[in-house]
Regions:
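Structure-specific DNA junction-binding interface
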Residues: 1-92, 187-202
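A structural connector/turn signal
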Residues: 42, 115-118
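C-terminal extensions
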Residues: 91-116, 133-202
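Small-residue hinge/turn detector
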Residues: 124-125
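Conserved hydrophobic/aromatic packing and binding residues within compact polymer-binding modules
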Residues: 128-131
Length: 202
């Protein structure tokens, strides 16, 4: 599940103030899984928010990216990147309208008591019932169609954006984003075994 393209959230042309090695850094959000990345940018380039960059495996196509440093969390973003993220996510969602409209048409229950739609902000039992009834009559065709057919329903793009941000901050369920990377738990015996096996490899 690797990202191919991403949009710039923030750019530090002089790098991080506290970094030992100062190099131009960009914070990027993937267009497919909304993965948050920290990347080193090639020298003498200028970037701005919402610039689209190739971040896939083909190194020859990476015209502006020197290398991907790491996947980062929402909390690790700069204040500037956090201020841009909502509008950038909206832009991505609008560009993938068919996929997200199909989510409303195809999503199903998580359990006996809960439906995927109820994970969206401001979607309670009444809205859930209304959406299911409407899509049974006719599949939704666009964001505009959803808004027009659902009385008192907020802008679906805003609702989806809020859900993506919630997942990026950390959530029990992940509908649209990649779950956080699992880091090894160094507790008791597991910690000792990890370092013992690592020592053998050396």
């Amino acid at each position: 599940m690797m990202e191919e393209y991403g949009l710039v959230l923030g750019y530090l042309p002089l790098g991080k103030p506290n970094a030992i090695q100062r190099e131009p850094i960009a914070y990027i959000i993937g267009k497919k899984f909304f993965t948050l990345l920290e990347a080193v940018i090639k020298k003498d380039l200028k970037l701005k928010s919402e610039d689209e960059l190739y971040i896939g495996k083909d190194l020859e196509k990476r015209e502006k990216i020197d290398r991907i440093k790491d996947r980062v969390t929402y909390e690790e973003l700069t204040t500037s990147a956090k201020s841009e993220i909502k509008e950038v996510i909206k832009k991505i969602i609008i560009s993938r309208e068919n996929e997200f409209v199909n989510f409303f048409n195809r999503c199903g229950p998580i359990s006996i008591r809960q439906h995927q739609l109820e994970l969206l902000p401001n979607i309670g039992k009444k809205h859930l019932t209304d959406i299911l009834n409407e899509r049974e009559k006719k599949k939704f065709e666009s964001f505009k169609d959803i808004s027009e057919r659902m009385e008192h329903f907020h802008d679906p793009v805003d609702i989806l954006t809020e859900r993506v941000i919630e997942e990026l901050k950390g959530s029990r369920y992940y509908l649209f984003t990649r779950p956080p990377s699992q880091k090894p738990k160094f507790e008791g015996f597991e910690k000792k075994r990890y370092f013992r096996e690592r020592k053998r490899r050396w």
